[in-house]
């Protein structure tokens, strides 16, 4: 992993003991950016993060001043999750995580909730293009999803 951006360190997740901190980051980020998410879906997803979602991906953690502040989860060529604590949003942490997983894990795909305009713009500005749309998300919930791939013309 790499160090850069001052005191930002990108590293592999240290295992299950770190999951509670990652759930806190997820909660902060989702509350700030996913106002379209139904409360019961929020609770259900949150309850499955440590048991189902985190173990299914390779997690990269962004740490600032010794504290986790963001993370990315990758499966194959797909970025399955990227969340940054709302307290440090806009400081380049998401960009650093995305650059790391593209360069070192071969990420070339991401799915984005259609209602999450900020995330869509983030990925477009970093070279991703929309290649498809699904009416339901991966868990068959009524959250339309945009399928994006890294453009070869970056």
Please report, for each region that a protein language model flagged, where it lies by residue:
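A short beta-loop-alpha structural element at the N-terminal edge
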Residues: 8-24
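A short, internal acetyl-CoA/4′-phosphopantetheine-binding micro-motif in the GNAT/acyltransferase core
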Residues: 78-89, 112-113
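A short helix-loop-beta-strand connector motif used in the catalytic cores of GNAT acetyltransferases and
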Residues: 50-61, 78
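Conserved beta-hairpin
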Residues: 58-70
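Conserved GNAT acetyl-CoA-binding A-motif
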Residues: 103-115
